[in-house]
Amino acid sequence: IRDRNNASSILIQSWQRFRRLINNSINDDVFVNSRSMATDLHQVHLSDEVLNINGGEMMVVDIAGITEQLQCLVFGDIIRSVYSLKHGDFDPDERTSTKPVPKRIIIFVDELNKYAPSTSSKNSPLLANLLDITERGRSEGVVLFSAEQFRSAIHERIKGNCGTNVYGRTNAIEVSRPDYKFVPTVYANMMTRLKKGDLILHHPVFKTLLKIQFPFPSYNQGGSK
């Protein structure tokens, strides 16, 4: 019920939804500071795994099974752990690996617009970390590589600091947005008709856009041909 004497009051239903969201988040098992010792569960602390990553290794974090709010928290924790590793901001006993810290760490994230949308608040800690990577990460050996369905949905400063852009097939509505004003009409029309495996590359070293073809897999992926 809204207070008639206070136009800025919040509905009780809104408070209830907010309370439910907070309770579901803070009471989730992801916040339990312990892990099972059962070897078949393979439970680890993500921050410990990031701090012990070595050159040439790949770490995959599947967050599809948790809520969107928790996905942001997990992603933010990984980003902070990577920066702690590169800056040496960790206790010596936390890194058990005897190998040197990798000179370069590449972070690949799917659907970056979920974590740094164009409508993101300026006070978002996660956005601040992502902006730090895109603006200064290259000099510190941290590279952000992302894939998303709609480039226009990403925060402006992140797009502005992107050195290489690769475009796949998209729809006419997306191509008509301001993000594609620099794209010649012939290439814009081409983006709506690209075949699977065909891409358009944009990089400052080239004077024009380039159409490239992703190599066909050299092995049998199974399924119908």
Where are these regions (language model features)?
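P-loop NTPase motor domains
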Residues: 1-129, 139, 199-205
